[in-house]
Every structure is written in structure tokens, then in C-alpha cells.
Amino acid sequence: GKAPNFLTTILSNPLGDSFTFSPLVLHGNVPLLPSTNNATGWGVGAKAVGRTTPSDTGWSNQITYTTPSFGGLKANLHYQFGEQTGANDSKKNIGLNAIYMAGPLTLTGFYERDQIMNPAAPNVPLTNTRKDWMLGGAYDFTVAKAFLSYGQSDEDNTNAKAKTAQVGASVPLGGGKVLASYAQTKLQPVNQSRKTLTVGYDYNLSKRTDAYVMVMNDRITSYESGNSVGLGIRHRF
């Protein structure tokens, strides 16, 4: 099932759940380097701190409770069993999110306490408990829709922190939309930063089919910047 961070993330940025071009998703959920590079904070594995939400966008073996909607406000409570033995048998993930929608306004946020890293078979215990949260929102001005989010991850027993801010916009143009999003993540205490900008255009060919082109620039401390270009056609079944 979906992790607490998933809905908050996709509602707070104009590129939704794109794991290729959404700066917010890339900074929050996608590791950059092999585990041998964990010293920089950008790797994968139990010691990596470069992601705001290291437990991924999906939690297996979880229980979720969804509240009724109260005037546009709804919340989801999550509990994931850790499936660990021995010294790690008490480890688990817990979290919640809340979503408020009223007319052109969307407000959302999540909180997670992560002790298990997803996805993995079996799930891998994190070296230290991680506490992650994000606040985000969007407002549709008709001529443009604005997006904003801020999130932070803290490790217990260390000074490791990841702080991510993102701003974006979606502007109707012709038969589609111009999409733009910028995210910046700062790591402490290693003083590393990542800055990602994506600009693109998504054109509706029909109700279920669209064509898109995206350009992305990615910059990381101590590494050469990278540029990516993508284009494609998407059909929803």
C-alpha cells in the first residue's frame, strides 16, 4: 500500500509521481549512488541520509485507517510491521498524513517514524531511527497553479539532517500545460547540497493520451552537474 509520504508528495508538485523528472520525488525518494558512497550522504542503504523519505513511497504488510472527510479534510493513519527477528524485532514504521481540499486550495502534510527501509526482501532495518515530515500545498489561480513544499528528515543518535524545499508551477497553454519545478536539499553536518530544476510541456492528445517533453538540470556538491532530456507519449488504460 501507499506510504504516508506518497499523496503529500504528488499533490505538492506539478510533476506528480514522476520518478524521472519530478525534483521533489527525486530528492525525497530516489537514492543517487551505490552504498559505497554513503559517506557523502547521497547513497543507498541503511546509512544514506540524502533522501527526505528513505522508507520509499510504498509500505508492504501495513494497516491503514482512513478517517471520514470533514469539510474537505481527511487523514490516513499507517502502521507497518517490521517483520524483524532478534535485536530488531521491535522495529516498525508508523506514520500519518492529512489532506485538505477546498475549491482551488490544497493543503497536505505527512509525518513518518522510519525504522525499516522499503522496498526490500526482507525489509532492511535502518541504522538509526529516522523521523521525516513534509508540509505542502497548491493553489489554482486559473491562469496558473502554484505549488510549494518543505520537508525535513532527522536521524536519532546523530546530527544527520536532510532539508528539502520545492516550488513549482503549472500553466495552461494551448492544449496542454507548461510544467516547472525547482527543489533544493541541504544535508547536515556534511554541508552537501543538491539543486534540481525541471521544465517541460505536457500536451493532451485525448482524454487518456498525452505527449510530453522534459528538460532537467541536476547539481550536487562536489560532482559535475547533469542534464537530462526526455520525450514520450503516455496512454492511461
Task: Tell me the role of every PLM-derived stretch.
Residues 117, 153, 215-221:
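A short, acidic, flexible beta-alpha connecting loop/helix-capping segment that sits on the rim
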Residues 1-3, 76-80, 108-112, 147-151, ...:
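Transmembrane beta-strands of outer-membrane beta-barrel proteins
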